[in-house]
């Protein structure tokens, strides 16, 4: 399987972290927080956390405090189909593929629920064929891009589906929740909105040759409570614990070692690193575990700086950035991780 085109999309409104702090301080919600919570929010929004700006599906920042089930769902249904469609259109254009040529579409999300799913909306807007195979994948959190691509690879390998459209879209601002839990507060300061897409084909395209060589996954259910969504008061509430950076690095290294061993590849052969930018501390833990420099993970750091953690689309933003930069070819390691606790990785052969 080859990745023959990628595309990304974000909401039009982009906010600096300092703007978020200023708006929060002026809100009624801020007055309801305890002293510790206020200090956490100030430290994360005003400190050096690796994030400068985030794109949010909010016409005004103070709309972030409209935290009711109906308001959050309305935000998701308004923005998720639009972002998914925009990213897909750009991926199709990059691949030089017309929508009717797509045989299957897969969409991953964890920040909202629709029935029929997002594939119904995106397929209609894109003009995909009525007989397209449409699969909605949910519940995989920040790591969803790689399982989505693994599913696409299985469809392509079956010989029944030629070109597959893979989309990840998250409206994290439709899953904001505020209380005095540190993980909840940090989540509100960390996550942004966006969508990423890729077109997959059994043959290479006209651009850079990106071959899906091999992949691996790891599911550690014993660590489930370290990172997951729960339902509270009819809304999603993110559980984010301090163990996440270490767990991400540990499990990523396990998947990496297993995948390389199966493919008889040595670590020194890896020339590119495409990591999900889960946060500053996550990237630092990955750098330490893999003995990498800031330059090695520069695309991940840049995506985090400009967009925050967008959950599942983030790693597709990093891949697109590396390709656009003209990063040296060879074997690239692409990895995502998230709720489960799950971790996924893929070897890409790039020319």
Task: Please report, for each region that a protein language model flagged, where it lies by residue.
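Condensing-enzyme catalytic core mediating Claisen C-C bond formation in acyl metabolism
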Residues: 1-78, 172, 178-250, 254, ...
